[in-house]
């Protein structure tokens, strides 16, 4: 399977995100990337949009419902939100949507900071394997993988996708 080019996806996503926000009447959203890949995608997306907006970052490690199974990530970093959440329109950005658990954890953390007016979800890839009813508003590409396959984003410059075979 050949994987799409992240730079091309981000260019397309910027166009779709701009149209989505205009359709909803949102002119000054707050952008938040989920560590680590979502931050890289968010930085590239802001550049593609020509936006000087500050970028918030979330580390959702403590909010995940599966760290008893997977263990705590060895490099937990604090979240950094240089703006208010209460009443704001947020654009939440992640690299790969698989189970939906990272997004659920991010939403839980965001609501600890306040009640946003809206949350628009943007993902570089949707692996069409959600375990929770979570779907992105803007997505670069949707892929269907075998159960033993995963996609990993490396970066930040350049952003590259790699197909990993867990069966090997």
Swiss-Prot record:
Its EC number is 2.4.2.9. Substrate binds at residues 36-37, 77, 94-102, 151. The keyword Aminoacyl-tRNA synthetase does not apply. It is an enzyme of class 2 (transferase). It catalyses: UMP + diphosphate = 5-phospho-alpha-D-ribose 1-diphosphate + uracil. One of its GO terms (molecular function) is uracil phosphoribosyltransferase activity. SUPFAM superfamilies: PRTase-like. Keywords: Glycosyltransferase, Transcription, Transcription regulation, Transferase. Disulfide bonds: none annotated. A motif (PRPP-binding) lies at residues 90-102. One of its GO terms (biological process) is regulation of DNA-templated transcription. It comes from the Bacteria. The keyword Metal-binding does not apply. Belongs to the purine/pyrimidine phosphoribosyltransferase family. PyrR subfamily. NCBIfam families: PRK05205.1-1. Regulates the transcription of the pyrimidine nucleotide (pyr) operon in response to exogenous pyrimidines. PANTHER family: BIFUNCTIONAL PROTEIN PYRR (PTHR11608:SF0). This is Bifunctional protein PyrR. The lineage of its organism: Bacteria, Pseudomonadati, Pseudomonadota, Gammaproteobacteria, Pseudomonadales. The gene is pyrR.
């Amino acid at each position: 399977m050949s994987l799409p080019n992240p730079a091309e996806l981000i260019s397309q996503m910027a166009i779709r995100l701009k149209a989505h926000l205009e359709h909803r009447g949102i002119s000054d959203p707050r952008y938040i990337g989920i560590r680590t890949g979502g931050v890289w995608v968010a930085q590239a997306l802001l550049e593609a949009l020509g936006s000087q907006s500050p970028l918030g970052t979330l580390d959702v490690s403590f909010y995940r419902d599966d760290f008893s199974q997977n263990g705590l990530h060895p490099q937990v970093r604090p979240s950094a939100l240089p703006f208010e959440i209460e009443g704001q329109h947020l654009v939440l950005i992640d690299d790969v949507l698989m189970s939906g658990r990272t997004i659920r954890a991010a939403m839980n953390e965001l609501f600890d900071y306040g009640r946003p007016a809206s949350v628009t979800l943007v993902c570089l890839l949707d692996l069409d394997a959600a375990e929770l009813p979570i779907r992105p508003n803007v997505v670069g590409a949707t892929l269907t993988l075998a159960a033993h396959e995963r996609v990993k984003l490396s970066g930040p410059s350049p952003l590259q996708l790699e197909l990993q075979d867990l069966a090997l």
